[in-house]
Amino acid sequence: MKLLLDTHIFLWLISGDEHLPLEMRDAILNLDNAVYLSVVSYWEIVVKYQLGKLPLPQPPELFIPIQRVQHQIELLVLDEVSVLQLPHLPSLHRDPFDRMLICQALAHDLVFITVDSQVMAYQSDKFIIFGNSN
């Protein structure tokens, strides 16, 4: 499978947070799966860090790439194909970061890993969203 991590899932994974459901952790750590973190998540993390809403042990420009490499997570760039999904996406969720992550999952046939109930409203046959947190 090709997995796209929602921002909170990436943060839970790298911090060892117990909110990360076991089935998600197992899927992410399964070496048969390709795991991606979107540049959109980088952007979200940097914005929240700058606003003082997300403490990190190092500045995000150092911390995120190190954690991504240590956890064998590939970077997913934002491309035109993904952005052009946006006009076709129902307005079920107001968060622009989540909306663009959903577009990337749809555009690239990725399994989107999240526990965000608002994102789950977008569930379709093109990608799967795992269930609830512990």
PLM region descriptions:
Residues 36, 76, 128-130:
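General small-molecule cofactor/ligand-binding pocket signal
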Residues 7-8, 45, 86, 105:
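Generic structural signal for small/hydrophobic residues in well-ordered secondary structure
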Residues 100-134:
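Acidic, PIN/NYN-like endoribonuclease modules and their adjacent C-terminal/linker elements
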Residues 1-38, 51-66, 108, 117, ...:
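Short, well-structured N-terminal submotif of metal-dependent ribonuclease cores
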